[in-house]
Amino acid sequence: MPSDASTGAVAPAYETNDAVDMYLRLHYPSESTTRGEAFGYFATDDDGRKIHDGFDAPRCGPAYTETRFPSLVAEVLRRAHATRDLLRRKNPRGDGEDDDADIQRRLREVSVRVDASARALDIGCAVGGSAFRLAETFGEVIGVDASEMFIDVAKKMQTDGELKYTLRAFGDLGRECVARVSPSEGADAFKAIAARCDFRVGDACALGGQVDALGGRFDAVLVSNLLCRVAEPRKVLDALVELVEEEGLVFIASPFSWSEEYTPREEWIGGTESQGDSPLALKLEMDKRGFVEVCLKAVVADAMVEPEKGLLYHTAGGEAYHVLPCTIQEHERKFQCILSVAQCFKKTRAS
C-alpha cells in the first residue's frame, strides 16, 4: 500500500471507497467485466470470437484486463516455489534455455499441488487477491497491508467469498458489481483456501524484527507493485533477510514509478544518474543481502497466456526482463496501464 514520503503514513488517496472499488475490480475480475463487452468496446461474431467495435484498445488496455495481475504474480511465485531446486542464476544477457525442459516437466508432474508445510508472505496484499491464489499452494499465507480499509475488505472476502462494489460511469453514477474469490480448482475449494490465509494491518517498511510476530520465517515472499510506493524501500529489503528461509524465494514485481510524492529521491532504488536502471540496482541491493537473482523464463511462460508471454524489457545494458501487464480500471472509460518488471531472488546464505 502506497505511503506518504514525508510521514510514512498510508497515502490518503488509497484510503477511500473509490480505491476499494478499483482494487476489488483488479483483484477479483469477472468474465463479464474483464473483457470490455459490458461497455460495448467489443462485439463478437457468430462463433463467439471478439471483434473490435469502434474502440482500438491499447496493448495493455481493456483487452489486457484479462491478465488478472494479482492472480498472475501469485501464479508465477507458486510455480517458482514448485521448481525452486531447478531455478538457476539469471544470465545477464537473457534467460537461456538450459533447464527450461526440466522445469516444464516438473510443473506437469506436480501440478502446483499444496505444500502444507510451506509459508508465504504477501507484503502489500491490498484486498487479498494474490494471497488467496498463493493459498492454493502454500499451507499458510499471511497478507500484510498498511491500509485498514483494504485489510477489512480482504477479511470480508475471506469470510464471505464475495463483496459488492461500484464501477463508476459518470461522476456519482455507476453500476453494482460483485467481486468473488474464484479458486482455480472451483468454488468447493474456497473454504480450505480461505482457512490458510491471515490478513493483518502492517507497515511494509517496519517488518524488521517481526519474525516471531509473524510466526516464523517464510519459504516465499511476494512484493507486488509496492517498492516505488513506500517511503523507505530498502527497509522492505532489509526485512527480507530475516523473514526468508534459506533457499527461500522473493518475487518482486514493480513498474519502478519513482516519485517524490511517495519516496524521497535519496531512497530510490535506481532511477538516478549515479545508480542507473532500477532492475539492475535492485539486483545489486539483493546481492548485498544474500539473495541471487534466478531465471524466470520457463516459470513465466507456464503461468502466462498469449500474447503476454513475449513482453520483455531491455535495460540500457542489454539485460532482458519479463514484464507483467496490469490494468486498473478507474471508471468505465479510464484505465491505468502498467507494465511491471518481474524479478525473482533466492536466498543463498543464512542470516
Give each language-model segment a name.
Residues 147:
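Conserved SAM/SAH-binding beta-strand->alpha-helix loop
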Residues 202-221:
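A short acidic, Gly/Pro-enriched loop at the edge of an enzyme's catalytic core
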Residues 61-116:
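Conserved alpha-helix/loop element of class I SAM-dependent methyltransferases that forms part
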Residues 159-207:
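S-adenosyl-L-methionine
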Residues 234-246:
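A short glycine-rich, Lys/Arg-flanked "PGG" loop and its adjoining helix->strand segment in the class I
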Residues 116-126, 142, 251-287:
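Conserved class I S-adenosyl-L-methionine
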Residues 127-137:
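Conserved SAM-binding loop of SAM-dependent methyltransferases across substrates and taxa
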